[in-house]
Design a protein with these regions (language model features):
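N-terminal presequence-like segments and the immediate start of the first folded domain
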Residues: 1-20, 136-139
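Electropositive phosphate-/nucleotide-binding environments in soluble metabolic enzymes
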Residues: 30, 34, 38, 59-63, ...
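Glycine-rich phosphate/diphosphate-binding loop of Rossmann-like nucleotide-binding domains
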Residues: 11-56
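Active-site rim loops that border cofactor/substrate pockets in soluble metabolic enzymes
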Residues: 46-75
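Short, ordered loop/turn segments at secondary-structure junctions
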Residues: 28, 85-86, 121-125
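Short coil/turn connectors at secondary-structure junctions
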Residues: 18-19, 75-78, 111-117
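Glycine-rich phosphate-binding loop
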Residues: 64-105
Length: 139
């Protein structure tokens, strides 16, 4: 299902200059996650979030996003953004990583002290990930 018609209207976002953001980025598939981070920062900057209110940490892969987000929640930020990309391969590894990551982030939302935004692509192909990280479906 295409999400192209559901792009965020950034004009509807309130001024966020007083909010502190923690961003946790997976280094795995960094050609995709770097573009997702760029899009995320563009939205934050366009809504008056100063660079000094943004902390970024990198983790090895999407599985480690949960740990990174937990650490970030402890840094007294207002919101955490988890950025990752899992691309399906030939084994069940994709399913295990996607399930563990999504459930872990859900648990942080239920039990943590601030929301964690799920910006993790779970695509069948590299082409799908490219299309969703600044490609034809935006960022």
């Amino acid at each position: 299902m295409s999400t192209a018609s559901f792009h965020l209207d950034t004009n509807l976002i309130n001024d966020a200059n007083n909010l502190k953001f923690g961003i946790v980025v997976s280094s795995w598939n960094n050609n995709i996650t770097d573009d997702l981070l760029e899009g995320c920062l563009k939205v934050l900057y366009s809504n008056n979030v100063p660079e000094s209110n943004i902390q970024i940490i990198n983790v090895p892969g999407s599985f480690e996003l949960v740990y990174g987000c937990k650490i970030m929640q402890e840094k007294e930020v207002d919101v955490v953004i988890a950025i990752g990309c899992v691309i399906k391969g030939e084994t069940k590894h994709f399913d295990f990583i996607c399930n563990a990551t999504s459930n872990g982030i859900k648990d942080l939302n239920v039990n943590g002290n601030c929301p964690v935004i799920f910006c993790v692509l779970t695509d069948n192909t590299l082409e799908q990930s490219i299309a969703r990280s600044g490609g034809k479906f935006g960022n």
